[in-house]
Amino acid sequence: MIDFANFYQLIAKNRLSHWLHTLPAQLHAWQHDNQHGDLPRWNRALNKLPQVAPGHIELHSRVEIGSAESLGEGERKKVESLLRHFMPWRKGPFTVHGIHIDTEWRSDWKWDRVLPHISPLAGRYVLDVGCGSGYHLWRMVGEGAKLAVGIDPSPLFLCQFEAIRHFAGNDQRAHLLPLGIQELPELRAFDTVFSMGVLYHRKSPIEHIEQLRNQLKDDGELVLETLVIDGGVNDVLVPTDRYGKMRNVWFIPSSAALKLWVERCGFTDVRIVDENMTSTDEQRRTDWMINESLSDYLDPTNPALTVEGHPAPKRAVLIARKAKD
């Protein structure tokens, strides 16, 4: 069973210590109540991962741990087989002792679009909401973050993260907690808060933006990435049923509307720094994610539309600063 004791000990000595009033009970309840049928199998796979000195670790330009020479052929096949227990791998990629985990998403491309526009992460406390397998947590550590905390309720993402951390020498600069943002108290402690690919899944986008704000210290930075449509300040797409075969898509604003929402929630210096059409090179089926992917969600006769006839996925990156309360 995954143990969060190291995280408790870590935050007891820093600005997140007040989180200990609620967090241990929440995670104890999660461990007790989580009934995902595959969790025992994933835990067994985690426990079977061999101890291998990480040696070379590269987190700045990519996530690469160790080298192919660190493992013999038989051991490498064993490790790859164990890592495949955690399929589908959606967010990455990762390279572990010469094993390339080719994930569905090229999350490194998103990072390359975001990084030039954000404040330097060196020495910062960072929160990544909806962090998936934690790929971007490692890139944040690679940029010098003092502590990178990710939250995502998926037990599979937690196990994927712990598998990578195992090979990274149990690095304690990054942590993933199986929680949703609605379960966090108003910590007001992070220098930077990321929410990437989450807003359109929320029934109340304004509430989500306010929840993000409540995690930031005064003058902290919000990095918000989400689906957008073309249009003016009052244009918002609300799918009648599905968007790209996803049922849980609620609001897709124009970039102008998104900017207004964030300003109304008490942020200043709000700016859209990037817009990008998602391509089938960035999101695609791979040997590590064999289910449907973006090409299956687009109209086969017109890739500018989803199969439902909505505009194809376009993503914007917004940066903002929390005004003082």
UniProtKB/Swiss-Prot annotation:
Domain of life the protein comes from: Bacteria
EC number of the protein: 2.5.1.-
InterPro entries: CmoB (IPR010017), Mo5U34_MeTrfas-like (IPR027555), SAM-dependent_MTases_sf (IPR029063)
A GO MF label: methyltransferase activity
GO biological process: tRNA wobble uridine modification
Pfam (any one): Methyltransf_9
Reaction equation(s) it catalyzes: carboxy-S-adenosyl-L-methionine + 5-hydroxyuridine(34) in tRNA = 5-carboxymethoxyuridine(34) in tRNA + S-adenosyl-L-homocysteine + H(+)
Keywords (A to Z) from UniProt: Transferase, tRNA processing
SUPFAM superfamilies according to UniProt: S-adenosyl-L-methionine-dependent methyltransferases
Annotated binding of carboxy-S-adenosyl-L-methionine, by residue: 91, 105, 110, 130, 152-154, 196, 200, 315
Cited CDD domains: AdoMet_MTases
HAMAP family for the chain: tRNA_carboxymethyltr_CmoB
Description of how the protein assembles with itself and partners: Homotetramer.
PANTHER family: METHYLTRANSFERASE, TRNA U34 CARBOXYMETHYLTRANSFERASE
Family classification: Belongs to the class I-like SAM-binding methyltransferase superfamily. CmoB family.
Function: Catalyzes carboxymethyl transfer from carboxy-S-adenosyl-L-methionine (Cx-SAM) to 5-hydroxyuridine (ho5U) to form 5-carboxymethoxyuridine (cmo5U) at position 34 in tRNAs.
Record-given protein name: tRNA U34 carboxymethyltransferase
Record organism: Aeromonas hydrophila subsp. hydrophila (strain ATCC 7966 / DSM 30187 / BCRC 13018 / CCUG 14551 / JCM 1027 / KCTC 2358 / NCIMB 9240 / NCTC 8049)
Taxonomy of the source species: Bacteria, Pseudomonadati, Pseudomonadota, Gammaproteobacteria, Aeromonadales
